[in-house]
């Protein structure tokens, strides 16, 4: 088998395709969460704290000198990223929890024994008939007090 055909067999397996779709959706979801945190959650939170814009929160380690930009410790952006992570982690946790609950319900569901096929039913009937035919005859008992 050539490397190309092996790769093709690997790439079209259901799990790999599902994983790729999950990664793409996850990346899009990450952008949505980042926008939600940066544009919806942080502005009101900054307003409650006293009109603070979290994206501007930083400690200047070295001011800008000439064409060299300032060296900043941007802890406000870090706070936003931590909040992003918490929201994404919570969403993933809830998804995994729902999937695990569904798996437990599937495991609890009683599985009915498979119905026998027509061939199996017919073979069972033949077996039962053969057993009946091959039964030894019941022993005949003669009562000596009874006339024949």
Curated annotation (Swiss-Prot):
Segments passing through the bilayer: 9-29, 79-99
Keywords: Cell inner membrane, Cell membrane, Ion channel, Ion transport, Membrane, Transmembrane, Transmembrane helix, Transport
Keyword Ion transport: yes
Annotated SUPFAM superfamilies: Gated mechanosensitive channel
Annotated compartments: Cell inner membrane
Membrane association type: Multi-pass membrane protein
GO MF entries: mechanosensitive monoatomic ion channel activity
GO CC, alphabetical: plasma membrane
Described function: Channel that opens in response to stretch forces in the membrane lipid bilayer. May participate in the regulation of osmotic pressure changes within the cell.
Family membership noted in the UniProt record: Belongs to the MscL family.
Complex formation: Homopentamer.
Protein name: Large-conductance mechanosensitive channel
Organism of derivation: Pseudomonas savastanoi pv. phaseolicola (strain 1448A / Race 6) (Pseudomonas syringae pv. phaseolicola (strain 1448A / Race 6))
